[in-house]
């Protein structure tokens, strides 16, 4: 019996992925800020006081309520980037998957077998979409700078920064970003598909229940974060530099190995698995559950 999934409409994919992105940013933006600040920190943290200073920066001595509000820098950029990213990734991957199914299904099936071939097409489609995600890089750069290096903004808005710095500078690190996204998205969608195929035994992935989507999203998210961790550290350090003090990815790799050792490339992995992991699982499972439901509503 052929392993085929029911197709959803483009509008359903747009609504489902956008809803997942909006709900994710509302819940997880402060967590993302903490993770980015830990990854950008070059010193060893040996006490709770030092951790407090790294996370809250100049506001570390203020009351807890005020400190918590400082974890929402760059929310406008973050919201714009996250919603567009989720729409592009979660809504776009099915289109890439359909393209591969239409033109290369036989090749994948001959190479990997029918069941594994289906999962590999899903992974390959995710990788293609992940590489194309660099078009959104300027918003990601501004989001990270607002989270980790807010003084580089100096009161400037988006248009002023674009005029002052030039669009090219906002695409700084695009090669490293593509190199990170390709295996990361491959592992995300591939892990998700393999879990549905081999652990859950689903024939039509779109018919997965919320709990099944949750389980498969855990597998995909953990695989993605582990695979992309080293390149994610490099990408983050490229992007959080001052606009007037850029540093190449190769120089960052060299200096990191020299000053911090190879384990530095996995800095922030544990908090990222504990923080970004649930965030990615949440939005991925939500998008996979909402898209078929929106499709059913729109088809009535």
UniProtKB/Swiss-Prot annotation:
GO terms for molecular function: guanine nucleotide transmembrane transporter activity. GO terms for cellular component: mitochondrial inner membrane; mitochondrion. It is a multi-pass membrane protein. Keywords: Membrane, Mitochondrion, Mitochondrion inner membrane, Repeat, Transmembrane, Transmembrane helix, Transport. Pfam families: Mito_carr (PF00153). The keyword tRNA-binding does not apply. InterPro entries: Mito_GTP/GDP_Carrier (IPR053042), Mitochondrial_sb/sol_carrier (IPR018108), Mt_carrier_dom_sf (IPR023395). It is found in: Mitochondrion inner membrane. The chain crosses the membrane at residues 14-34, 85-101, 122-142, 173-189, 214-234, 268-285. It comes from the Eukaryota. Solcar repeats lie at residues 8-108, 117-198, 208-293. Its main location: mitochondrion. One of its GO terms (biological process) is mitochondrial genome maintenance. Belongs to the mitochondrial carrier (TC 2.A.29) family. PANTHER family: MITOCHONDRIAL GTP/GDP CARRIER PROTEIN 1, MITOCHONDRIAL GTP_GDP CARRIER PROTEIN 1. Mitochondrial GTP/GDP transporter required for GTP uptake and GDP exit from mitochondria. Involved in mitochondrial iron transport and essential for mitochondrial genome maintenance. This is Mitochondrial GTP/GDP carrier protein 1. It comes from Saccharomyces cerevisiae (strain ATCC 204508 / S288c) (Baker's yeast). The lineage of its organism: Eukaryota, Fungi, Dikarya, Ascomycota, Saccharomycotina.
């Amino acid at each position: 019996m052929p392993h085929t999934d029911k197709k959803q409409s483009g509008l359903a994919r747009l609504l489902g992925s956008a809803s997942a992105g909006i709900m994710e940013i509302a819940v997880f933006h402060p967590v993302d800020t903490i993770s980015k600040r830990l990854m950008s920190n070059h010193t060893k943290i040996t006490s709770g006081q030092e951790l407090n200073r790294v996370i809250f920066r100049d506001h570390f001595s203020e009351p807890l309520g005020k400190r918590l509000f400082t974890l929402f820098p760059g929310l406008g950029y973050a919201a714009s980037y996250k919603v567009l990213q989720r729409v592009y990734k979660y809504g776009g991957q099915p289109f890439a998957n359909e393209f591969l199914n239409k033109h290369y299904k036989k090749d994948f099936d001959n190479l990997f077998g029918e069941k594994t071939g289906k999962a590999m097409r899903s992974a390959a489609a995710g990788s293609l979409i992940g590489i194309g995600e660099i078009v959104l890089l300027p918003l990601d750069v501004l989001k990270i700078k607002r989270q980790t290096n807010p003084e580089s903004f100096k009161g400037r808005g988006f248009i002023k920064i674009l005029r002052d710095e030039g669009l090219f500078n906002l695409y700084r690190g695009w090669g490293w970003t593509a190199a990170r996204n390709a295996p990361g998205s491959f592992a995300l969608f591939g892990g998700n598909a393999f879990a549905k195929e081999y652990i859950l035994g689903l024939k039509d992935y779109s018919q997965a229940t919320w709990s099944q989507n949750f389980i498969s999203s855990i597998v995909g998210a953990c695989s993605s974060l582990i695979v992309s961790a080293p390149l994610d550290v490099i990408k983050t350090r490229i992007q959080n530099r001052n606009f007037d003090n850029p540093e190449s990815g190769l120089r960052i790799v060299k200096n990191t190995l020299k000053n911090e050792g190879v384990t530095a490339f996995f800095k922030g992995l544990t908090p990222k698995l504990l923080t970004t992991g649930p965030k990615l699982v949440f939005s991925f499972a939500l998008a996979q559950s909402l898209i078929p439901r929106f499709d059913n509503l729109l088809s009535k």
